[in-house]
């Protein structure tokens, strides 16, 4: 056989397809030509610093690679493929003074750690990977297929404390006079804490449109401030949750942001396997109640029943471990059937059936 080297200068840089979230993502593509049976595509991807930072193009300034949580590294590496793969190798090098915890889930791989060039070098290898078999309505592949999770952060509480501080320092939930006027209007005549929480949650859910426009460097873990959200009346989940947190605080509640993963499990390794931002509010009994205004527009729920047994991490000042939402009570999801079957005098069967479903 022979080896054909592809010139990476021939890559094409395109705007990535986007819907509802327009954060300027790019996709880099290259044509490899027609492949014949037995051909193998061998490629290597090098990454530096943070794995999800929405970095913009520019000069090779090292500050571009500083992660939001400074000094910390994590990665989530799928070890499955949609195409037959001869060999996959993942290597990460970290400074000698750093510690890294990891775990391989739902499969096996060859792993090692070596001291090389003044660094710790971790390697993970899997051979002869075949496409993972899928089933109708199955769980997310991250919950079933082989994956590697790693993080230099010791525990979830550290991430919780950082998430709280980065948004409090930024002033994400600072009060706004015109928003305060709306809050006062909404809670007027509401006597219980749940009445107030409900009316604020549903106003935000129904009035902040889901449409994310990039605001530049602040995208990521930092929630946009009250003025921007209330003025624009649009944003992604973090903007909708941030608006609710601001409203709750202006109504006298203690509320904070939380990160969650809609659709799959979050592991005990504190790698940021999150795709969604929600809110938590402290009730009078001292417990935190999760709220998701993004998922409850024009319905009666405060936390979508589609998000049962879902992991989330509150960014609270005392710090928190990874939490999980409870199972929604069966009484909230009933189907009542009342049937009346009779025989008429002439022997004709007569049946009446009445179905009652919960309204949401």
Where are these regions (language model features)?
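Solvent-exposed beta-strand/loop surfaces of large extracellular or lumenal domains
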Residues: 1-28, 52-73, 103-118
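Edge strands and adjacent loops of beta-rich recognition modules
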Residues: 21-22, 321-337
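Short, solvent-exposed loop/turn segments at the edges of secondary structure
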Residues: 25, 36, 85, 117, ...
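Second-shell loop/turn segments in exported
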Residues: 27-31, 183-190, 226-234
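Secretory-pathway-linked proteins and extracytosolic
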Residues: 46-52, 56-58, 72-74, 78-218
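Short, conserved phosphate-binding/catalytic loop or strand-edge motifs used
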Residues: 216-225, 261
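Hydrophobic/aromatic-rich core segments of domains that either
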Residues: 238-329
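Conserved small/polar residues in nucleotide/adenosyl-binding loops
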Residues: 353-359
């Amino acid at each position: 056989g022979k080896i054909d080297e592809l010139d990476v200068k021939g890559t094409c840089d395109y705007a990535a397809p986007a819907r509802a979230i327009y954060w300027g993502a790019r996709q880099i593509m290259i044509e490899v030509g027609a492949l014949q049976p037995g051909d193998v595509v061998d490629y290597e991807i090098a990454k530096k610093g943070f794995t999800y930072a929405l970095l913009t193009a520019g000069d090779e300034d090292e500050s571009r690679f500083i992660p939001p949580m400074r000094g910390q590294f994590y990665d989530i590496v799928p070890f499955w493929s949609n195409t037959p793969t001869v060999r996959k190798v993942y290597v990460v090098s970290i400074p000698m003074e750093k510690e890294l915890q990891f775990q391989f889930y739902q499969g096996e791989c060859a792993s090692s750690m070596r001291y090389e060039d003044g660094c710790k070098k971790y390697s993970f290898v899997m051979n002869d990977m075949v496409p993972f078999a899928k089933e109708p309505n199955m769980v997310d592949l991250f919950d079933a297929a082989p994956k590697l999770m790693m993080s230099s952060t010791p525990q979830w509480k550290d991430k919780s404390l950082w998430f709280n501080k980065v948004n409090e320092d930024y002033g994400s939930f600072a009060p706004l006079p015109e928003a305060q006027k709306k809050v006062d209007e909404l809670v007027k005549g509401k006597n219980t804490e749940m009445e107030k929480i409900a009316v604020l949650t549903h106003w935000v859910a129904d009035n902040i449109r889901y449409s994310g426009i990039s605001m530049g460097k602040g995208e990521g873990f930092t929630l946009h401030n009250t003025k921007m959200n209330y003025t624009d009346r649009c944003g992604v989940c973090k903007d909708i949750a941030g608006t609710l947190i601001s409203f709750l605080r202006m109504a006298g509640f203690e509320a904070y942001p939380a990160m969650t993963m809609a659709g799959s499990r979050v592991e005990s390794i504190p790698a940021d396997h999150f795709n969604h931002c929600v809110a938590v509010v402290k009730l009078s009994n001292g417990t935190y109640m999760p709220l998701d205004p993004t998922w409850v527009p024009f319905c009666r729920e405060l936390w979508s029943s589609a998000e049962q047994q879902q992991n989330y991490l509150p960014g609270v000042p005392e710090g928190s471990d990874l939490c999980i939402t409870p199972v929604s009570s069966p009484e909230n999801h009933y189907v009542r059937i009342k049937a009346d079957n009779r025989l008429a005098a002439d022997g004709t069967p007569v049946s009446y059936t009445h179905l009652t479903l919960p309204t949401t």
